[in-house]
């Protein structure tokens, strides 16, 4: 059995045909050369292009990631600045409201004080007129009483009645 196996390995009973082996090797080498020239080059170019595309896509993705992170940081900064600006506006509004409140209160106090002074002035003026009127009436009454007294002597009771009468007359005027 081993002998039959050797025959199949070495070729049919005639041995190895070196001419056929050389032709097959040369055909294989020519086939490899043709494959290298016509198939391997374009296939390698396709593979290289694909590798460049993948690398470019990876670079683009990394750049997009960096851009997204940068944009996120910018947005955070803008949000922070906006919040600070809103806070400042609110604080300014509070300060302005307090100032307006103080100004309104001050103006109201000035007006009230002016009104009080005007009222005091009016009261004093009316008081002075009333005192002047009373003084005039007292003077008139005194003159009247004196003229009556000079005409006749009056008792204390009559004098009191006379003063009351003139005061009543003066009050009716």
Swiss-Prot record:
One of its GO terms (cellular component) is proton-transporting ATP synthase complex. It is a single-pass membrane protein. Its main location: membrane. Keywords: ATP synthesis, Cell membrane, CF(0), Hydrogen ion transport, Ion transport, Membrane, Transmembrane, Transmembrane helix, Transport. One of its GO terms (molecular function) is proton-transporting ATP synthase activity, rotational mechanism. The chain crosses the membrane at residues 15-35. It is found in: Cell membrane; Membrane raft. Belongs to the ATPase B chain family. F-type ATPases have 2 components, F(1) - the catalytic core - and F(0) - the membrane proton channel. F(1) has five subunits: alpha(3), beta(3), gamma(1), delta(1), epsilon(1). F(0) has three main subunits: a(1), b(2) and c(10-14). The alpha and beta chains form an alternating ring which encloses part of the gamma chain. F(1) is attached to F(0) by a central stalk formed by the gamma and epsilon chains, while a peripheral stalk is formed by the delta and b chains. F(1)F(0) ATP synthase produces ATP from ADP in the presence of a proton or sodium gradient. F-type ATPases consist of two structural domains, F(1) containing the extramembraneous catalytic core and F(0) containing the membrane proton channel, linked together by a central stalk and a peripheral stalk. During catalysis, ATP synthesis in the catalytic domain of F(1) is coupled via a rotary mechanism of the central stalk subunits to proton translocation. Component of the F(0) channel, it forms part of the peripheral stalk, linking F(1) to F(0). This is ATP synthase subunit b. It comes from Staphylococcus aureus (strain N315). The lineage of its organism: Bacteria, Bacillati, Bacillota, Bacilli, Bacillales.
